[in-house]
Each structure stands twice: as structure tokens, then as C-alpha cells.
């Protein structure tokens, strides 16, 4: 039997759990002329939610990861490539009739994938406007769905690009945009701050942790049926107590627990054994991460092991310095702030605890 838990890639089909509320909201947005903005911490399953929702939507989809884009022209090239993948060149010609700067299109002789380029020094804003408007013209009654992952990366490309994109995208009636990113604070800054060009651009959909009862049922149903239900429930509770219902880390720990159960059949201490295995397997990565940090960051992380101890208290380091360290740690994804500061990765927290106790 295959391991029924999955992490590290898109989770869909039988591996996908819950999110019925968020799926319903996203589907409602896609059935309207509006746009969706997905906001959550890293590894909460935004991409999986989108993929799972789009499985039932019979419409064309273009998806671009902004981390792979290095300029506005490269963004236009990516959009054209996706467009020509959906529409063969001969059939797509009439959508290009209004294009002011015509792209050079060729096809990879091995893969057949479209390749797009422009004459050097062409007007970048015109190129970008043309690319977006080609997508708009190809929409029609069945609106095109355009997904931008890691959307805040646009701020790193060119100054003022966010204003240009907003001016283009707000005119479109034949496209539903889905904008998302793993930098929660940046997403909030881009879409919830009044001064941002994308303020109120779309319907905000916040992804929180999966409710414990739902996640518990999901785990219990997938643990080996040879175990008594009481044992499966106890194991599920121990998993969720450690991961605090974080979607990614729960799947990761459940995967390892299931694997070890298949190997040994020993239920006693199975969750702690799986935790130890995962922490040990990431020792090199955690060590490199720790070595890259300055003294203040390390001190803050050590103090946060005891979650009841505010990192600002009882410290010889100025509060302003600690606050700056907290901001850095949140920005890098090591910490998350939900009321108070917490570790994002419970396995890294366990590693730091072991380091402190040496």
C-alpha cells in the first residue's frame, strides 16, 4: 500500500483535506467577474487549494510563478509562452491583431514548447500591456483564469511596476486573476494597505490552519487499519500536538509515522521516533541556517523555545534590536506572528531545543 500522506509538492485528490470553506469562496469568486487574493503563511497549501479548486472548473488557466521572472519583459514573454501553449499559433493570430510590438515566436525542436523574444530596446511597458491585452481578448464568455504565484516579487523587478500592472489589470473583464504569495506580511502590505496600488483589487481569502477535528479525522482514516481505533486516535492527537495543525508539517510527520509503522509495527513512542528521525535528517540544513544567523537572531530563537517568555523581557540587548531581529526572522519565514511570535517549523524548534540542552 502506498503511503497516504503527501508533502513537499502539490497536494490534490485523495491527499487533499478540508478547505471546503476556502474552496467554496474561491469558486464563488471564479464564477463572478472578480479576482481572488490568497493570503497565508508559507506552506499552508495555497497552491494545492488553487489546483484542487480548478480541477472542477472547465476553463483555460495560465499560471506564472513570479520568482522565475526577472523583468517586465520576461513577464510578458512568460505570458505569451503560456498563451501559445493554450492556442496554436495559426489559431492565435487573430488575438494578436492589436499588438503594437509583435513578439518573435519559435518552437523548441525537441520539446515543441513555444519560445518568445522581443527586439532589444523595445518599449517595455508597451510589450507588457500588449501581452496582458492578448490574454484579455482571448477570454470571452468563459473567462480566462490567470494565476500569479509569489506575486509580491513584482516589487523587486522594476520601480512602479505594481502601478502599471494595476492600471492594466483593472480594465479587464474577461479574466479572473488569482494572486497569491508565501510572504504573508508582503501580501498584506500589497493588498490590505490603502496606499498600495492593489488595495481592494480582489476578494481576500485568508488560509488558516486546518481545524484540529478535521485534521484528526483525516489522519485517523489513513493510518493503518490494522491498528485499533484508539491507537490511531492517540497517534493523530500526538501528531497534531507537535505540529499545531500546520498543514505541511502535519503531512510530513504523518508520512514518517506511517512509514515507521509499516517498518516496525511498533506503536509505542512512534510519534517521538518519527520526530527524531526528521530532525536528524535535517541536521545539516538546520546547522547551516543557524550558522548564517547573527548573535541576536540566535538569542531570540533560544528565548522563544519557552513560548511564555516574551523575547523583549529580561534581556541585556536593547528592545529595538530585538524587535529588528524579530522582523528579520518573520520576513525570512523562520518565525510567524499570530498574536505572538512562534516558530514556523516545529522540527527546527525541536533542533534548537536539543542544541540548547547540549
Named regions from a protein language model:
Residues 32-35, 39-44, 48-144:
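P-loop NTPase nucleotide-binding core
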Residues 117-184, 192:
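Conserved Walker B catalytic segment
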Residues 1-36, 41, 89, 358:
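A short, basic N-terminal segment
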Residues 348-358:
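Short, amphipathic alpha-helical interaction segments positioned at domain boundaries
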Residues 189-241, 263-265:
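Helix-loop-helix "sensor" segment of P-loop NTPases
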Residues 316-332, 342:
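Short amphipathic alpha-helical interaction segments
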Residues 245, 251-319:
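Winged-helix-like regulatory helical subdomains adjacent to P-loop NTPase cores
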Residues 338-350:
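Accessory beta->alpha helical hairpin/"wing" motif in late/C-terminal subdomains of nucleic-acid enzymes
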Amino acid at each position: 500500500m502506498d503511503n497516504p500522506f503527501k508533502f513537499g509538492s502539490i497536494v490534490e485528490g485523495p491527499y487533499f483535506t478540508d478547505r471546503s470553506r476556502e474552496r467554496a469562496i474561491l469558486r464563488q469568486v471564479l464564477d463572478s467577474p472578480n479576482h481572488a487574493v490568497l493570503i497565508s503563511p508559507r506552506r499552508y497549501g495555497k497552491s494545492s487549494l488553487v489546483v484542487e479548486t480548478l480541477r472542477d472548473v472547465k476553463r483555460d488557466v495560465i499560471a506564472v510563478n513570479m520568482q522565475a521572472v526577472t523583468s517586465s519583459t520576461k513577464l510578458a514573454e512568460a505570458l505569451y509562452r503560456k498563451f501559445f501553449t493554450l492556442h496554436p499559433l495559426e489559431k492565435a493570430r487573430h488575438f494578436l491583431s492589436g499588438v503594437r510590438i509583435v513578439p518573435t515566436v519559435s518552437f523548441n525542436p525537441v520539446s515543441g514548447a513555444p519560445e518568445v523574444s522581443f527586439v532589444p530596446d523595445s518599449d517595455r511597458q508597451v510589450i507588457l500591456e500588449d501581452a496582458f491585452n492578448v490574454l484579455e481578448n482571448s477570454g470571452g464568455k468563459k473567462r480566462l483564469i490567470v494565476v500569479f504565484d509569489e506575486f509580491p516579487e513584482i516589487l523587486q523587478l522594476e520601480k512602479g511596476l505594481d502601478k502599471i500592472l494595476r492600471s492594466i489589470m483593472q480594465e479587464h473583464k474577461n479574466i479572473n486573476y488569482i494572486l497569491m504569495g508565501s510572504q504573508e506580511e508582503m501580501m498584506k502590505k500589497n493588498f490590505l494597505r490603502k496606499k498600495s496600488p492593489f488595495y481592494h483589487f480582489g476578494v481576500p481569502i485568508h488560509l488558516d490552519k486546518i481545524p484540529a477535528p478535521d485534521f484528526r479525522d483525516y489522519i485517523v482514516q489513513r493510518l493503518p487499519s490494522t491498528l485499533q481505533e484508539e491507537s490511531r486516535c492517540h497517534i493523530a492527537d500526538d501528531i497534531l500536538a507537535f505540529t499545531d495543525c500546520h498543514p505541511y508539517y502535519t503531512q510530513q510527520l504523518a508520512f514518517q509515522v506511517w512509514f515507521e509503522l509499516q517498518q516496525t509495527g511498533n506503536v509505542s513512542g512512534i510519534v517521538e521516533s518519527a520526530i527524531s528521525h526528521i530532525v536528524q535528517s535535517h541536521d545539516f540544513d538546520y546547522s547551516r541556517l543557524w550558522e548564517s544567523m547573527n548573535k541576536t537572531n540566535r538569542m531570540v530563537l533560544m528565548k522563544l523555545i519557552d513560548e511564555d517568555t516574551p523575547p523583549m523581557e529580561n534581556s541585556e540587548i536593547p528592545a529595538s534590536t530585538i524587535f529588528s531581529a524579530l522582523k528579520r526572522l518573520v520576513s525570512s519565514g523562520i518565525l510567524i506572528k499570530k498574536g505572538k511570535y512562534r516558530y514556523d517549523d516545529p522540527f527546527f524548534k525541536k533542533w534548537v531545543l536539543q542544541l540548547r540542552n547540549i
